[in-house]
Amino acid sequence: MFRFAVTIFVSAFLLFQVQPLTGRYILPWFGGGPSIWTACMLFFQILLLGGYLYSHLLTSRLSARRQVQVHSVLVLVSLLWLPIAPDVMWKPTAGEAPLSRILLLLAATVGAPYFVLATTGPLMQRWFTWTNPGTSPWRLYALSNVGSLLALLSYPFVFEPVLTLRSQVLSWSVLYVAYVVLAALCGMPVWRLGRALIAGGVASGVEQAVSLRTAADERTPRPSLLTMGLWLLLSAASSVMFLATTNQLCIDVATVPFLWILP
């Protein structure tokens, strides 16, 4: 369990620290208005949703070994984005729409690493349940929340006052490389599990996904459309309230990372 716990903790820390770091980096380029942070959050929320969808499709459609292969390629490709410092070529020009420029800038700067980090929580928890049958993954979920909170609290009080932006970028990039190593260690038992399933005559991805379902999966009823709609509505409402509160604080006080994180 230790390797999965450390991997999920580090990924959650990096996932939430890169948000204020990137926003702080590009803030002066686009005039310092509250809309800059809103555009950043739009990008991060889209990639977060995409990461969850990727994890679901990966674990429900591909064999265990194929999952490791596909995810390994994705993780290795994401290293090409390091270090994550935005290039000056992305600075806006007069009359250009800032939203599209910000989205393209973020995609070119942190897109792949952020997407990989977004996949880690659900993917590693699923891999953990397969390789550790009978052990609950909910402690890993709680640990990811701890890592996220620590990242948000440490940035305005520790990293931003002490390190330059360049040093922050390099520190984050080094820690991301460490995360890649940890993710590889988590993939090893899944690879061995896939080999054992093939030896047992379970070869296809869907067949392996069915055979790896836990007893809890079988007992859990499928949620109704009303329940899923309520989940979607509540999630959207919380995001809207978060952005509205953050924007109002930035308008009334100042556009600084601490106020982005506070809500």
Q: What name fits each language-model region?
A:
Residues 1-263:
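Alpha-helical transmembrane segments of multi-pass membrane proteins
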